[in-house]
Amino acid sequence: MATELTVQSERAFQKQPHIFTNPKAKANKKTKRWYKDVGLGFKTPKAAIEGSYIDKKCPFAGTVSIRGKILTGTVVSTKMHRTIIIRRDYLHYVPKYNRYEKRHKNVAAHVSPAFRVEEGDVVTVGQCRPISKTVRFNVLKVSAGASRSKKFSKF
């Protein structure tokens, strides 16, 4: 995932829609920041409260609400900007052979700059309104991935 170097990296001026940025304000005052609690037992990360990033698609500091399904999966790809691909494994029953077969689905999810996500991490995502053509989920919690010894590796 690309790291956020500066807040003002886009062509348009980036600001939170709920906060008035007064150019005449004293420089020593702490800047105001708007954030919210998404509910459902998920804590707002410290980076969302104290950070300086601007992300309108963030569930904690943006305008997106979480409703619907809550899913868990393993991060497979972090190559896109602020978007990850998670893999959800499941078993499908085949009645003819009276056995189960392994299957998986890939789900694209928006990841807020409040989280540092790497491949192999286990993330919990919540459903939100469609953010783009394929993205309908938002990362709510990041858990550390499985240790290297437990994972499959060639050597």
Curated annotation (Swiss-Prot):
Cysteine disulfide links? none
Please provide an example of a Pfam family that matches this protein in its UniProt record.
Ribosomal_S17
MF terms in GO: structural constituent of ribosome
Give the UniProt keywords, A-Z: Cytoplasm, Ribonucleoprotein, Ribosomal protein
Q: Which CDD domains match?
A: Ribosomal_uS17 (cd00364)
- Keyword Ribosomal protein applies: yes
Q: InterPro entries under this entry? A: NA-bd_OB-fold (IPR012340), Ribosomal_uS17 (IPR000266), Ribosomal_uS17_arc/euk (IPR028333), Ribosomal_uS17_CS (IPR019979), Ribosomal_uS17_N (IPR032440)
Picking any one GO biological process from the record gives: translation
Q: Where in the cell is it found?
A: Cytoplasm
Q: Does the keyword Iron apply?
A: no
One GO cellular component term, please give it: cytosolic small ribosomal subunit
Subunit notes for this chain? Component of the small ribosomal subunit. Mature ribosomes consist of a small (40S) and a large (60S) subunit. The 40S subunit contains about 32 different proteins and 1 molecule of RNA (18S). The 60S subunit contains 45 different proteins and 3 molecules of RNA (25S, 5.8S and 5S).
Q: What does this protein do?
A: Component of the ribosome, a large ribonucleoprotein complex responsible for the synthesis of proteins in the cell. The small ribosomal subunit (SSU) binds messenger RNAs (mRNAs) and translates the encoded message by selecting cognate aminoacyl-transfer RNA (tRNA) molecules. The large subunit (LSU) contains the ribosomal catalytic site termed the peptidyl transferase center (PTC), which catalyzes the formation of peptide bonds, thereby polymerizing the amino acids delivered by tRNAs into a polypeptide chain.
Q: Which family does it belong to?
A: Belongs to the universal ribosomal protein uS17 family.
Protein name per Swiss-Prot or TrEMBL: Small ribosomal subunit protein uS17
- Please tell me the species this chain comes from: Candida albicans (strain SC5314 / ATCC MYA-2876) (Yeast)
